[in-house]
Amino acid sequence: MLEKTMRMNYLYDFYQALLTPKQRNYMALYYLDDYSLGEIAEQYEVSRQAVYDNIRRTEAMLEQYEEKLGLLRKYERRRQIIERLKDYISRRYGADAELAALVRELDELD
């Protein structure tokens, strides 16, 4: 469950601009603020089932966006490459402060 929550948080971060305000609100409350379905339903004066259905549809949409655009996949790949680069530089060029600063700057872009 934690893995799914983390994935949804990342997908939400990347694709939230493509969601409707209602979808954004439900997802933020459920995944970021850890509200229960019942709490969200009460806040919006809808049924728990309506909230559940909306969240599941939104999750499916986020997965479709990722399948087509691959922003999370590319982000994770960049993170892996940067970690390898940092490791290599620290082993081979540990005393090169300028190179270390450039890699740090690159790392902070994500």
Swiss-Prot record:
Lineage top rank: taxon = Bacteria
Q: Which Pfam families match?
A: UPF0122 (PF04297)
Q: What does this protein do?
A: Might take part in the signal recognition particle (SRP) pathway. This is inferred from the conservation of its genetic proximity to ftsY/ffh. May be a regulatory protein.
Q: Which family does it belong to?
A: Belongs to the UPF0122 family.
Sorted alphabetically, which HAMAP family does this protein's record hold?
UPF0122
Q: What is this protein called?
A: UPF0122 protein GK1195
